Amino acid sequence: MNHSLSNKIKLLKISLLSAAIFSIVACGSDEQSLKTVTDESTLSSSNSTTATGSSSTEQVLCEYSYNEYNDSTSVQTTSSTDWACTGTTRYVVANGIPDHDVGTFPNPDNPNTISEQTVSESFTLTPIQSDTTTLMGGPRGVLGIVLNGVKIDAGTGGSCDDSVDNCSLGDNSGNWSIEALSQDTFSFGTDDNNAHVQPDGSYHYHGMPEGFVTLRGGNSSTMTLIAWAADGFPIYARYGYSTADDASSPLKEMTSSYQHISTVSDNRPSIEIYPLGTFVQDWEYVAGSGDLDECNGRFGVTPEFPQGIYHYYATDTYPFFQRCVKGEL
């Protein structure tokens, strides 16, 4: 890289990151793209249902609740969440305050302060997997809620146009949607929980909620259910059985099936300034390249569902949390 280009990159990064202090840090772009394909894989197991069809979650974590003061410096208030199951519906009422340590908010790249929210969501207890996908997040609707009552919103409102000079972390007017976690050109001020704060004070996760996973006892020797998706299917953290329909198989870290695009568009902003992975459009689903489908999920057995159920995973690589759901809404 020549000296002139190197200086341009440094100046561009400084100006963009400084501007972030004054921008509205919005999340959940409605311009995100996802190549949707039908997942035709099935499992053959005598104790499993088919890979498409209905399941029941009515006996699982229906009375999960938490109500404790969080003395983390940037919180200093009570975290409250209550889950309940009635009839065919799972309900959550929470104040959106995390139950674990958080980073410093406001911070130089996220000017917002954590505050209590009104969280009230419902999910079916009998989710039905389909062959189609539905994009979620941001204006499309809540993708899922972690058990502590904090919402999942993996996308951002940041974007760039086709040039190298016009990017915003908040207005979502460009053709290229900026990722929060898979790049280091832009900073959205996320903490060690892969979370930050929206202008309304809403703390939310873009990726693995490390503090909550730790509180749940998550590690390489256990599957850890951490959230419910909008379609009613469960979301697990990081680890799953190496053989999807065999609970006696070793646990392994689940890998997504998203890869960097193989062909770069001529109108994409310079890769020298914005490396592959910076934008949502830099990723494509390659069936069979990982363990999971286009919604970062699969059908298989879990500790809570020994007969098998479709379920999602939070992963350490893109898409981190799924951007779509496979169940009926």
Where are these regions (language model features)?
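Bacterial N-terminal signal peptides that target proteins for export
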Residues: 3-16
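C-terminal motif of bacterial Sec signal peptides marking the signal peptidase cleavage site
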Residues: 23-26
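Solvent-exposed N-terminal domain segments of exported/luminal and surface proteins
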Residues: 32-43, 47-187, 191
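Extracellular/lumenal glycan-associated surfaces
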Residues: 123, 148-150, 199-212, 305-319
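A mature extracytoplasmic/lumenal domain signature
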Residues: 127, 156-158, 207-209, 239-241, ...
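Short loop/beta submotifs within extracellular cysteine-rich repeat domains
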Residues: 131, 211-216, 318-323
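Core of folded catalytic or high-affinity ligand/protein-binding domains
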Residues: 157, 170-216, 222, 230
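Extended, compositionally biased non-globular segments
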Residues: 231-233, 238, 242-329
